[in-house]
């Protein structure tokens, strides 16, 4: 974290990142605990939505988030899209709750029992995951493993669609989808992905990403930088705060893209489960409104997802700018100091 040259800086309790900045063991513990929180939310919220779900009302016209995503995966609904009971959905929710306890226990184990810094571990492979923020070889090694996990997740999604099947809005049923690995089509969808209208291309994009990420991950793990680590290559810029800022930029950008995609696309976000497409409005900030008449105070699943993603993405981007400026050495305390001194400041003109 940025210290502005103070070697004995003290952070407040709210600066949670400061406690794990140079302690890779605690960093892993925080990751595991965070995963547990996400799994707990997924399981608990699925049960909450299942208790409120009304089969007589279109799913897209109910304030639901988890159930529509399960429905698009063909879980809890038959091939015609009819709700077939909550047994499978309940089982998935409970599995997530159990996993949340496992992840939470893993976080406690890493935090209380294992070394706070992986560099002190007795396991050789574990020591490779020590944190050296200004060492590109160390950072690229860790990045490579992240990319491989993301690639494997893409493979799981593609294979689920190919073997089990997912909801096809055009056919109005669940069907198996073979990915279209046409590189020309994938390349062109970089510019019109918001209007993609067939599942084969969607799966093809995920299959390409799986190959790209796993290959890139292996490359980052196996290779080291060529030549001297100079300022031109980023020496002096690579730091914990800089990497945090880039992470916030990435997740913020993805959230905003997801908002636009959810608002307009009915192939990935079917009308059956998410409701009708939205209209973009402008007030103090951009926002999306429903195009269908609903009871007072009610909104479609699409409206909830779109607006939440957009505003979260907006604030993530603000966090990116904040931490990026700090990483570059900008001291925000000087701003408040300058503002407070405006009334007493004087200007002297030299002859």
Curated annotation (Swiss-Prot):
It is found in: Cellular thylakoid membrane. The chain crosses the membrane at residues 27-47, 64-84, 89-109, 202-222, 242-262, 305-325. One of its GO terms (molecular function) is chlorophyll binding. InterPro entries: PS_antenna-like, PS_II_antenna-like_sf. Its main location: membrane. GO terms for cellular component: photosystem I; photosystem II; plasma membrane-derived thylakoid membrane. Belongs to the PsbB/PsbC family. IsiA/Pcb subfamily. This low-light-adapted strain contains 8 pcb genes. This is Divinyl chlorophyll a/b light-harvesting protein PcbA. It comes from Prochlorococcus marinus (strain SARG / CCMP1375 / SS120). The lineage of its organism: Bacteria, Bacillati, Cyanobacteriota, Cyanophyceae, Synechococcales.
């Amino acid at each position: 974290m940025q210290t502005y040259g103070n070697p004995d800086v003290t952070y407040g309790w709210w600066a949670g990142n400061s406690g794990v900045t140079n302690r890779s063991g605690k960093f892993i513990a925080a990751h595991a605990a965070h995963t547990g929180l996400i799994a707990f939310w997924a399981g608990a919220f699925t049960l909450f939505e299942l208790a409120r779900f009304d089969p007589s009302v279109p799913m897209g016209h109910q304030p639901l988030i988890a159930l529509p995503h399960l429905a698009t995966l063909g879980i809890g609904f038959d091939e015609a899209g009819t709700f077939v009971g909550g047994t499978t959905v309940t089982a998935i929710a409970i599995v997530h709750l159990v996993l949340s306890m496992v992840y939470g226990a893993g976080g406690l184990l890493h935090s209380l029992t294992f070394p706070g810094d992986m560099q002190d571990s007795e396991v050789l492979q574990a020591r490779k995951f020590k944190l050296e923020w200004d060492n590109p070889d160390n950072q690229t090694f860790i990045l490579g493993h992240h990319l491989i996990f993301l690639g494997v997740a893409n493979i799981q999604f593609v294979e689920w669609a190919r073997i089990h099947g997912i909801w096809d809005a055009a056919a109005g049923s669940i069907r198996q989808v073979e990915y279209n690995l046409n590189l020309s089509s994938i390349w062109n969808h970089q510019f019109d992905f918001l209007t993609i209208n067939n599942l084969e291309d969607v799966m093809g994009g995920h299959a390409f990403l799986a190959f790209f990420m796993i290959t890139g991950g292996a490359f980052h793990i196996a290779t080291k930088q060529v030549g001297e680590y100079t300022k031109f290559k980023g020496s002096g810029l690579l730091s914990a705060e800089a990497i945090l800022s880039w992470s916030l930029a990435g997740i913020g950008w993805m959230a905003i893209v997801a908002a636009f995609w959810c608002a307009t696309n009915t192939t990935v976000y079917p009308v059956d489960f998410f409701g009708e497409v939205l209209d973009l409005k402008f007030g103090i900030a951009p926002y999306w409104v429903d195009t269908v008449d609903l009871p007072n105070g009610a909104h479609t699943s699409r409206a909830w997802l779109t607006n939440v993603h957009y505003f979260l993405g907006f604030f993530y981007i603000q966090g990116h700018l904040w931490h990026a400026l700090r990483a570059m050495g900008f001291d925000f305390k000087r701003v408040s100091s300058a503002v407070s001194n405006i009334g007493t400041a004087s200007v002297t003109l030299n002859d």
